[in-house]
């Protein structure tokens, strides 16, 4: 493994959420007349699996038809997954977000094993997280989410801030206090929020902790971890006042990318496609090679194949193909989903890629540098998703004026103590 790969291998995963909602259709029987197979693929957000990319596979495998369904949110995908896992109704291939992947690994016996010849494809930590106690690899790694800062250069200019991406990186370089100070400066100059959402800051802070809500041995430390309380207080006191929304993924939030409600976002690669897809006519978006506090990773998922599916063998072949380095580089070009495959980091399709939408920013190179900046792999236990979702709700209550800072924290403590 190269020095670069080792540096990137320190990254931990985090989340994604979706744009298009469709239902999950059941798999068709592989024994249909003529050997035709309909494979259902269930994802969320934008994995970069465009119709054109999926058509490549269908052209190479004319007996296969792929039906791609995307859940409305990661929460919806999770609820559907655990409601139906081991029963009926899941897609042939199901995407799982890293924030609840450890939870899924509790049921690894219900998932088909990744073919032996695919092993060793991924960053060490990515593959290890998908390997169960019996040594079975049951998840095909898709992407990771090293974060930079996406910003509107036109809105920065209006506030008297620099607009060149190198100058913006220098402006925002440093700790979170510096980031919030720049945000306060922007708000004072414009009267508008600087960043899209308070809970994106919570995500960024938590993803820089080694331990969040659970210890690796399963010990629950959520309400007793001073780092979590500090993160909550920081978000409520510094991020809420400079944020346009409490959270992300609402209709208004999607629309806000085009209407200038805010000037910046904490931005993993997969967010690039979300921004360009929701603000296609806006010309001011750019990407800076910087992140508060040094480095951060938000994003990353796996493809899993339910072992009781009707087309397990064919589903494994498709999942294998989709997560090969060549296809993940194409997915990155399509949607900014940064590959988790080691060989991809030597591919010029990644390293030399520039994104025309983001003022021709070298987002491939930025992604590699942002990945190298990550030094902490946050442990995310089986209940990470539930604890974190509840803490986001606590921030939202303060943002909406439903509860004050102390009351909302105490509400969270009471709520999660019952988990």
Predicted regions and their residues:
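Extracytoplasmic ligand-binding clamshell segments of periplasmic binding protein
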Residues: 74-78, 196-201, 211-288, 408
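C-terminal capping/gating helix-and-loop segments adjacent to ligand/active sites or protein-protein/ligand interfaces
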Residues: 357-415
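Hinge/lid segment of periplasmic solute-binding proteins
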Residues: 97-148, 177, 286-287
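Conserved N-terminal structural module of periplasmic/extracytoplasmic solute-binding proteins
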Residues: 2-101, 119, 163, 310, ...
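Extracytoplasmic/periplasmic substrate-recognition and gating elements
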Residues: 240, 277-340
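Structural recognition of the beta-strand scaffold that forms the well-ordered cores
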Residues: 40-43, 67-70, 92-97, 139-141, ...
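Helix-loop-helix "hinge/cap" segment bordering the ligand-binding cleft or interdomain interface
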Residues: 59, 132-201, 214-245, 307-313, ...
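Short helices/loops that flank or line small-molecule/ion binding pockets
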Residues: 78-90, 155-156, 178-185, 238, ...
